[in-house]
Amino acid sequence: MTAPLTTAEIRERYLYFFETKGHLRLPSHSTIAPDPTTLFTVAGMQPFKENFMGAPAVFDGQPSKRVTTAQKCVRVGDIENVGRTRRHLSLFEMMGNFSFGDYFKRDAIHWAWEFLTGPEWMGMDKDKMYVTVYKDDDEAFGYWTQDIGLPAEHIHRFDADENFWPANAPLEGPNGPCGPCSEIYYDRGENYGDDTWGDYYQTRESARFLEVWNLVFPQYDRQDLDASGQPVLKDLPFKNIDTGMGLERVASVVQDVPDFYSNDVFKPIVERVAELSGKPYEGETSVSHRVVAEHIRSVSMIVADGTAFSNTGRGYTARKIMRRAIRHGYMLGLREPQLYRLVELVVDSMGGAYPELQHNQSRVEASVRAEEEQFLKTLEGGIKRLGGLLSGMEKGSTLVGKDAFELYDTYGFPVDLTKEIAEEYGVSVDEAGYAESLEHAQEIARAGSKYGKSELFGGHQEALDGLPATQFVGYDQTSGDGQVLALLSGGERLSHLPAGSEATVVLSQTPFYGEGGGEVGDTGRLEWDGGAGIVRDTQKTKQGVFLHDVLVEQGELKEGTRVRGVVSPERAAIQRHHTATHLLHAALRAVLGGGVQQKGSRVAADQLRFDFSHGAAMSAEEIAQVETLVSRWVSANFPVSWREMPIAEAKAAGATALFGEKYGDVVRVVRVEGDVDFGGHAVSSMELCGGAHVSRTGDIGAFVIVSDENVAAGVRRIEALAGEQATAWLRGRLNASAKAAALLNTSPEGLEERVSGLQGQLKAAEKETAQARRQLAEAQMGGGGSAAQTRELGGFKVASLKLSGIEGNELRGAADKLLDQSGADLVVIASDKGLVVKATKDAVAKGAHAGQLVSKLAAAGGGKGGGRPDMAQAGITDAAGALGALDTAF
């Protein structure tokens, strides 16, 4: 029996298939969104939004109107369903093929059908395929029925709520690219339900009919409704294609498993969860197994991409996902950090496609473990809080739902665990009240998710009514006094906060900077008579109210209390990085040209990150020029000043404003009081900015760019360090250079020459070794490949040969030579270090698939592998075993 394709093989086949259709294969974009309107990348097309609007389709210097990707996506709008159903995921892989003004509906439909049903690709049963189309899209309906031959009864026509992307965009928006879509479904059979395709038309729900692919035809630019309330859809400059095939969905069909958690990626993780917890994957606890498995995969990818657990933005969402996993691990009996041990399994299954997982495995494991250690302590605090509530209640009474939700929202306490402990006291839980509070919080989260980044402290809108804007005194000082105006939790005003509790605190004035303009919010301490607390984060509302996330360490904090705020010493490092960001921006415009526009930034104590528009990677010379310009500003020790002025005056003075950013009538302008020279031209820095900065450029200290990478079409990302962080990084490089020089018996100054000489020697040795291996292979092959065994298998002429001491390129070269000399349709060459299968074009056209064959043979040879229809390879340890499986592999 043929082994089902692995998820990795399905991914590779998809990308290779579209490469054969003239598509440029691009790597996945980071889970960090390429634009500031969303926290995470939520769709395969997101990195290409500008291309859909007409921007040149050039990627790292390669022009291509056809692109294919495997995109890692994060969606958390319905995270509470993850694990409770077997289809919801917070992280999923979206396979996509895209056209920017090239092919359109006909090709998109034909190629999707070919890939799904073609025997050399996915081989799905054509009779089990069903589709939906937009009710007015006769063009797509015609292609499905007339070109493909799909019976009309296998097609449903739906309105814009179902078959338009974004859903119901004509009436509800958002503005921008949109168009009708056609969804492809697969009938999994009566084992998954006795409903029919006709039933699906009425219910829109089915476990039996699984959507596997959505073909979107973005051809319109949605505008505001006209005066009569009718949709306005203008034609885009050209018609586009945006498709999304759910990799996990297709894998469940191809592998014939009942759900995502039974596929080859999730199953090992679920089994490991059962092993760590001692709880089998069955019954009610299976929900927790699935939550832990899914969330650890999601968090591993998010953290590997550079998001750190925090109380703001992406870090806050990552923390929510991680803490939900920890809660469910706790319900399985895991009282000590264990989930970090699962990261290795995620890397094993996905690291080949996403090498950032491999490169950052240690950091991910350390981050997950630290979060486990911290939150398990918080869970214990929740237990104490619940015990305090229950101890004063009579048997037969009911714990109010708001208190149950506070335990969940503040301490991450599962309501199931709350109910279980309450029963020991003879107390029930108001589940309806809990559900009401939870739904209220979810509505706020969904609203923020739909339109962009939600505020960390969402849910306080009503509670904030009537509060004045906070007076910020932190530009000139890092400590200051203020009065507590409000204590907020779960959208409600509190009268006091006891020790061990965490909530949002509003002060009359504050030295803590509220996150904005790319600069992270300040942390530090609050102190008052008889108490103290940790300020974990600071945010700011649009109305200018500063929100401090405070954990009370000792004493009790009450509304009206006078407090003293002390900003963390990290502020100095943040200021260095923020001013350095301004200088970096000015230097980039000088070196790369005025077309450079800021696309986003993050300024923190440990580093700065700067996203900007530029079509190609920077050269080493350009990076050096930028670093030199910044260093000139630092050496000159110019004053850094700021003042508020009308926006028209600021723009007239040449202040740089962020493209697309909305400003008020009066703006704050930060200026470096001195220019530096670049090629005979004076370069200056003056920007609209509300952030905190150093007082003189000399305070920045050392500056170094540590990376330059592509994050989206036409968008680059620089990461850089300033001050102590830069010095430490440079010292580490110098130490590494000294150690390397010592190992090579030279000085650091002579390291380049020494390495160059060794490389030359190595290349010469490799060349000699390769030549010797080729000669050895030719000797073993015999004249004209006479040593090979040739026979008919599965309608193909197959030549096979075992070689000794041959691997890598020489093994592939031997396969090429044997294919030329033997006249065979397929050749199979094996050694105890590798296996190669190659097929002629004619053989591939007749259904041969080297990748499928190599998978079967590798399994018998103690290894695994895969590849394209015409060429595939594997690592094995038993050549005889692999070749011995040939007769049964066809």
Curated annotation (Swiss-Prot):
Its cofactor is Zn(2+). One of its GO terms (cellular component) is cytosol. It is found in: Cytoplasm. InterPro entries: aa-tRNA-synth_II/BPL/LPL, Ala-tRNA-lgiase_IIc, Ala-tRNA-ligase_IIc_anticod-bd, Ala-tRNA-synth_IIc_core, Ala-tRNA-synth_IIc_N, Ala-tRNA_ligase, Ala_tRNA_ligase_euk/bac, DHHA1_dom. GO terms for biological process: alanyl-tRNA aminoacylation. Keywords: Aminoacyl-tRNA synthetase, ATP-binding, Cytoplasm, Ligase, Metal-binding, Nucleotide-binding, Protein biosynthesis, RNA-binding, tRNA-binding, Zinc. PROSITE patterns: AA_TRNA_LIGASE_II_ALA. One of its GO terms (molecular function) is tRNA binding. Catalyzes the attachment of alanine to tRNA(Ala) in a two-step reaction: alanine is first activated by ATP to form Ala-AMP and then transferred to the acceptor end of tRNA(Ala). Also edits incorrectly charged Ser-tRNA(Ala) and Gly-tRNA(Ala) via its editing domain. Belongs to the class-II aminoacyl-tRNA synthetase family. This is Alanine--tRNA ligase.
